[in-house]
Amino acid sequence: TSGALSFFYNWGRHKINDGYGTGEEPIDDRFNSKDRMMGLSWYQSATLFTGNRLTLGFDYLHFGGHAWSHYLSDGHNEDIANKNMDELAGYIDFRQAIGNWLTLDAGIRVDHHTQVGTEWVPQGGLSFHLPENAVLKAMVGKGYRNPTIREMFIFPPQNPDLKPEKLVNYELSYSQHLWNGALVYGANFYYINGDNVIITDRSTRPPRNINSGEIENWGIEANIAYRINSLWSVSANYSWLHMEHPVLAAPEHKLYAGISFSKGRWGISTDLQYIKGLYTSVDTGSEKQENFVLWNLTGSYKLCKFASLFAKGENLLAQRYQINDGFPMPKATFMGGVNINF
């Protein structure tokens, strides 16, 4: 048997000045907020008989906070939102090996959200173990996303009556390990169909978040990694996505290639990423897409068993790009620090 129990807690205090444009007057209010999040997670796995694995688990999440505007002219505050929510979930996963060639996976999760209710989430799959360390998998599963506090309660177009987004994913994949694991490659084919997607209805005044969007995607993902020797390794992956309905921050094409070197205490890696057709806005009639290339470089030096130095450069080509319309990403960025592992 095996299992684990984990707990986390974090909080934040924020004061934001939205600024003002050239020729405009400074705004009088400042956004303020206090937020917190805590969670508890437990699972236990057991083998009941040969080839079997049964896992039971429970998750609890508490989150929320208080947001308000503070006015400088007279010092008064106006509430924006003061909400706290809880999510409780239990799940069971079952895995059974049938001989040496087939593995069956099935599971179900029930999630209760204090604002939007209860959701059942089933999934299942088959894995066929083929000769030469090859595996063919077929999977189907339900997915969902609960609306956020911001979407329901903070700023127009908030809507407290939003429901979860839902989808079903069908996936067929093939992977293989060759040359004692030095070469690994694989490919994925998938189809996603969903509804209740949260969109902003701009035909009303003020605009309002509603559950009327749809998602229907299909695509291909391929990956390959090769360990040349004890010092060098390379990897690459590519994905193509067809979207019947545009999805925010989703690219039509994504290509990645990277190489890494390590010897003794030293390590260095670099990668190049090409993005084409990334939707930064999906508003009907005003869709926007971005194309860009990102080059990153990272180096590290191990000081001792538990500490290492690192230096990193991101977007070294200083590309101007956005992931969400109106929010430009940084150009070339450099950082460094110390990693400590306990």
Task: Please give the residue ranges for each predicted region.
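Extracellular loop and loop/strand-boundary signature of outer-membrane beta-barrel proteins
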Residues: 22-31, 43, 73-81, 107-112, ...
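Outer-membrane beta-barrel signature, preferentially recognizing the C-terminal barrel domain
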Residues: 33, 83-85, 135, 139-194, ...
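Residue-level signature of outer-membrane beta-barrel architecture
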Residues: 1, 44-48, 86, 95-96, ...
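Gram-negative outer-membrane beta-barrel transporters
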Residues: 97-100, 104, 189-193, 210-280, ...
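Transmembrane beta-strands of outer-membrane beta-barrel pores
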Residues: 9-13, 60-66, 86, 108-114, ...
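Outer-membrane beta-barrel "beta-signal"
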Residues: 127, 171-173, 329-342
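Residues that define the transmembrane beta-barrel architecture of outer-membrane proteins
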Residues: 34-38, 84-88, 118-120, 166-170, ...
